[in-house]
Amino acid sequence: MPIKKGSLVRAVRDKLDNSLEALANDTRWPSYLFETDGEVLDMRGDYALIKFGAVPTPPVWLRQDQLAESGAAAESTS
């Protein structure tokens, strides 16, 4: 199912490592990107604005192919 605004997602480490975004940033990714659910706030082209609510951090833009719907969200739509 395609990711859309309001979806709960997690970052996929394999897709984020060695990406263009990894080359432009510190690649010591915070664990909350992969271990907690983030909500899609906005979509623009291939990118989604994600707010991870478990920690007080600003939202981040990630490519949609670097995201996977979280288990809880995917199960509730099945």
From Swiss-Prot:
It catalyses: a plastoquinone + NADH + (n+1) H(+)(in) = a plastoquinol + NAD(+) + n H(+)(out); a plastoquinone + NADPH + (n+1) H(+)(in) = a plastoquinol + NADP(+) + n H(+)(out). Its EC number is 7.1.1.-. It comes from the Bacteria. Its main location: membrane. It is a peripheral membrane protein. GO terms for cellular component: plasma membrane. InterPro entries: NdhO (IPR020905). This is NAD(P)H-quinone oxidoreductase subunit O. It comes from Gloeobacter violaceus (strain ATCC 29082 / PCC 7421). The gene is ndhO.
